[in-house]
UniProtKB/Swiss-Prot annotation:
Keywords: Cytoplasm, DNA damage, DNA repair, Hydrolase
Name the UniProt record assigns to this protein: Uracil-DNA glycosylase
Purpose of the protein: Excises uracil residues from the DNA which can arise as a result of misincorporation of dUMP residues by DNA polymerase or due to deamination of cytosine.
Biological source species: Helicobacter pylori (strain HPAG1)
GO cellular component, one term: cytoplasm
Keyword DNA repair: yes
């Protein structure tokens, strides 16, 4: 079986990225990911959500990109069942999962900047459906092992996604939180897109709270689309 048998990808994205899927680097990603999936190891997010970020936001609908690093590797208990926190969207978690510290800080800053009510759950899929691509640079992870799939090769694929979007859609609002995400600035054509940077929202990082990042995003969105982005959840 092929990757897309385990991890569905929408027709719009398959057409948009068609030439990538036969390249040696992608075939190697497919091989390594399927090997991990078939091993005794537990891989997050569940394979059906591997491309959830892409499936929720078609290429033609992308207006904002919020780039993450890799999926959450932890679990939570629901009805005595251990479930993955990761759901395939950067920074987002399953509806009933506890809200992680980074996401709590995102909600705090959003409230401080724009007065948006702090939601009771951490599912950001509503943002994705409104045109915010919540893409992780690395799309999978082994349970309880942060950055464990760094060597699978996902970053080559996510870089291609970004570069194709930068060519096709203009102007995009590209939000890069933290030093790892900000390395992607080199991929962004100058003077074509709006780049917004801030420290990573992790409590281990300093400077995110008070950065005004959501004010910057909203101002940029108004400039491009002449209306507000709806941040409500």
């Amino acid at each position: 079986m092929k990757l897309f048998d385990y991890a569905p990808l929408s027709l719009a994205w398959r057409e948009f990225l068609q030439s990538e899927f036969k390249k040696p680097y992608f075939l190697e990603i497919e091989k390594r990911y399927l090997e991990a999936l078939k091993s005794p190891k537990t891989i997050f997010p569940k394979s059906s959500n591997l491309f959830y970020a892409l499936n929720l936001t078609p290429p033609s609908a992308v207006k904002i990109i919020l780039l993450g690093q890799d999926p959450y590797h932890s679990t939570y208990l629901e009805n005595q069942q251990e479930l993955p926190v990761a759901m395939g969207l950067s920074f987002s978690v399953e509806k009933n999962a506890p809200i992680p510290p980074s996401l709590k800080n995102i909600f705090k800053e959003l409230h401080a900047n724009l007065g948006v009510s702090v939601p009771c759950c951490g599912d950001l899929s509503a943002w994705a459906k409104r045109g915010m691509l919540l893409l992780n640079a690395i799309l999978s992870v082994e349970k309880n092992k942060a950055a464990s799939h760094k060597r699978i090769g996902w970053e080559a694929f996510s870089d291609q996604i970004l570069m194709r979007l930068f060519e096709a859609n203009a102007p995009l609002i590209v939000v890069l939180l933290g030093k790892v995400a900000q390395k992607k600035i080199a991929l962004i054509p100058k003077n074509k897109h709006i780049i917004i940077t801030a420290p990573h929202p992790s409590p281990l990082s300093r400077g995110f709270l008070g950065s005004g990042v959501f004010t910057s995003i909203q101002n940029a969105y108004r400039e491009v689309y002449h209306k507000d982005f709806d941040f409500s959840l």
